[in-house]
């Protein structure tokens, strides 16, 4: 969310322990889906993002769920998000979300989660001085031909 400059963040789906799954917030200014895709590809170093929706639609309130997003579609709709950025969405769930007025951007699990490896690496280095820590950054595990 921070990488996209989202503001006024809140938890997308609250869990029993007071934490939550995903986040929802606002872009600094409304933009087109196409412009948002360009930003996502730039910030996350991606070649592709799968779109369920209209590339010319305007979006401002954005929900993010880096893992599978199918379980938070209803929450995103209830919180009036214009778009859900997720790491995985099924074909039918993407179509169903569109019918509810929600644009879906599937950036893949790797696409949204690879940045976490470097954050966790630095964290573990600080706490596990006697253990060799490494990163196996193998890249996107699939090809779009």
Locate the predicted segments by residue:
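Hydrophobic structural segments
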Residues: 1-145
């Amino acid at each position: 969310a921070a990488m996209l400059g989202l503001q006024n963040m809140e938890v997308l789906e609250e869990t029993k322990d007071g934490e939550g799954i995903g986040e929802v917030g606002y872009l600094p200014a409304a933009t087109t889906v196409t412009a948002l895709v360009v930003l996502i590809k730039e910030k996350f170093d991606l070649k592709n993002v799968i779109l369920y929706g209209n590339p010319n639609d305007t979006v401002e309130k954005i929900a993010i769920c880096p893992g599978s997003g199918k379980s938070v579609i209803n929450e995103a709709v209830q919180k009036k998000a214009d778009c859900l950025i997720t790491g995985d969405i099924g074909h039918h769930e993407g179509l169903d979300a569109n019918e509810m007025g929600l644009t879906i951007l599937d950036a893949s699990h790797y696409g949204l989660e690879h940045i976490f490896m470097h954050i966790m690496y630095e964290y573990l280095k600080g706490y596990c001085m006697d253990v060799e820590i490494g990163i196996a950054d193998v890249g996107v595990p699939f090809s779009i031909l």
